[in-house]
Amino acid sequence: MKLEREHVVDEIIGDVKTNKFKIGEDSMGIIIDSLINLYSDPIGSIVREVTSNCYDAHREKDLKVAGTIPITDEDDPKWFHPTSKKPQIEFQEENVLLGVGNAFLFRDFGVGLSKKRVEEIYTLFGNSTKRDDNNQIGGFGIGAKSPFSYTDTFYIMSKHNGKTFSYMLYRGNDAFHMDLLTEGVTTELNSTEVIIPLDEKESYRDIKRFIKAINNQLMYFEDLQFINVEEGGGRKLKKATIDYEDQDLLIDLSQQHEYNVKEVHLIVGRVRYPLNHSMFEDGLWERDEIPCGIKFDVGELDLVPSR
């Protein structure tokens, strides 16, 4: 998502001593904590942000194959999956490899996560590869770290150009860390997995909360594959049935009848956002008339990071 930056001062005339604001090393953890805790709905934000990153990884791969954006020296198309391979969300009742119990796994088959990208992009708060165009959803540089708003530890497994990497991301006493656990070779094509262990004490409740977030956040996402989410989670997933759609509006009557969703809402790209009706004059519309989504392209609205 291309971010619009406001320029307040374009030029300083005269001999003026300028001091740039900095972040003290000892305060880095506090600042990062503040960024992570921006999200008003942590689980909903995790589902939205990590799934959007999965789609962005596929989009980046497809744009590079098409020649729309340049291939870098880290890219080797022979390791790319075909476009028919779609992002996945999986519920795992146990991950023996990592030694964790219930977990949600988000898997993409995009360009893969190289060691260089980990060092230069993934571990830097505010860094993003998505700010120069509106071809991808992200752009703030904090969405990949959104799992920290729910858990102190999560994992990433990456396959990139014939190599495998597994990482543990965790919150330390004074900073956040991403440690390389294992490195090996593989014949499998590129992919990235984000594994979020559930709180052991609240696992049953949080399974339901994650599935509710999937239903609320991702109902308009297309070509998304679910593995053991309904079966393992014990709750039905919503499937949008589009009754009407044009360039501005989308109507899905099944939301009203099956899920009691009646509000007018926003759709940015394919992400569903609630609309704050209190900001509008009374009587502007009957909010309980019909479940209608107002559509916007990525980059058309200025979204806040706390969304």
Regions found by a protein language model. Give the residues of each.
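Conserved short strand/loop->alpha-helix "switch" segment adjacent to the catalytic nucleotide/phosphoryl-transfer site
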Residues: 22-49
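Amphipathic alpha-helical transducer elements in NTP-driven molecular machines
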Residues: 44, 48, 141-144, 148, ...
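Glycine-rich ATP-binding loops of the HATPase_c
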Residues: 153-157
